[in-house]
């Protein structure tokens, strides 16, 4: 469930998609939220890699004690630094944004800071289920990947919850099922948020500036209203 998040269910929750080291864009988006820095925020993971300020983004999330689920990029970094057993992905990290992350850490404390953040990553849950319901009585289910198909076996198949993509499932069929939860996730980059009856894909590729197939926008979904807040990439 919501663990030790100490959420106030009389106030909305804001779920923010994959940040990927885009610090200025994240700060600008938070400034657009009604309660700004006092907002109840949950991140879908992938705080790091590709963008220039991975270390700074993680520091910010830790400073404000915002909630976050484990993203596949955090898992790749954990494996690269041998904080978790190898699954054969360790060489993938560097070529998928890890190099930029390393540069960020070199500017901000080096291995001491890396160790601090790896310890924090190890404590991140793979999913959060929040008993704050929408108009249909659906609880909030936050994951990094498309977790809905694994909801009934989420403990047993927790790793799949992190890595799952829409294209691996019949999402139109999933959208018609009643799990009692509404799944908000990142991982699948889309030009605009995809909001269905029981899930929302909110990674709008904020780091991908110059790629016409992506919007280079950071998105947040307000729960339970499902209103979307967005910020164009504004990295300097």
Where are these regions (language model features)?
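Divalent metal-coordination and catalytic microenvironments
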Residues: 18, 46, 61, 71-72, ...
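Active-site neighborhood of divalent metal-dependent phosphoester bond hydrolases
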Residues: 54-129, 137, 168-174
């Amino acid at each position: 469930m919501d663990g030790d998040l100490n959420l106030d269910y009389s106030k909305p929750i804001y779920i923010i998609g994959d940040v990927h080291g885009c610090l200025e864009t994240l700060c600008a988006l938070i400034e657009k939220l009604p309660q700004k820095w006092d907002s109840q925020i949950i991140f879908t993971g992938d705080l790091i890699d590709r963008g220039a300020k991975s270390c700074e983004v993680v520091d910010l999330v830790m400073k404000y004690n915002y909630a976050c689920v484990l993203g596949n990029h955090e898992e790749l970094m954990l494996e690269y630094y041998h904080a978790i057993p190898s699954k054969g992905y360790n060489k993938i990290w560097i070529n998928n944004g890890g190099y930029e992350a390393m540069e960020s850490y070199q500017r901000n404390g080096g291995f001491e800071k890396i160790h601090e953040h790896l310890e924090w990553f190890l404590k991140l849950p793979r999913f959060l289920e929040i008993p704050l319901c929408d108009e249909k009585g659906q609880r909030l289910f936050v994951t990094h990947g498309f977790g809905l198909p694994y909801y009934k076996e989420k403990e047993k198949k927790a790793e799949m919850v992190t890595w799952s993509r829409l294209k691996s499932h019949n999402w139109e069929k999933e959208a018609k099922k009643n799990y009692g939860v509404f799944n908000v996730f990142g991982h699948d980059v889309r030009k605009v948020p995809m909001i269905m009856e029981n899930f929302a894909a909110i990674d709008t590729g904020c780091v991908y500036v110059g790629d016409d197939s992506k919007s280079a926008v950071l998105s947040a979904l307000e729960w339970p209203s499902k209103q979307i807040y967005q910020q164009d990439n504004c990295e300097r």
